[in-house]
């Protein structure tokens, strides 16, 4: 597995992403990833908190307006995340925490889709399990993402 990761890491794009002084290279990608996380996590956290009863004056159906914000954040994170993986493929793809992060994000997306199809379309209050799961998954996505720079097992770049 490592040999194909080394090939990606030796590519011109991977090297440029890691080593370029251009602001739109690695630092810019990190900024886009952070903004995407803010949009996705912020909107899903707002949904989860409202569904748990916080800010009851906001109608549940108004939460539907946050769903596109979450999708925009997810799209930004997918695009920037792919570039971050290209920059350090060995570091990312040999780290079990990376796969946990992806699993958590897929689960959070499933919860948001469930909410969008049901609860957010009517003014009914869901059980506490779904919004609690959404908040926990949102927090786990952030935590696992923040752990990635510190939990890698293999780093090929620069050797």
Regions found by a protein language model. Give the residues of each.
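Polytopic transmembrane helical bundles with strong interfacial aromatic enrichment
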Residues: 1-159
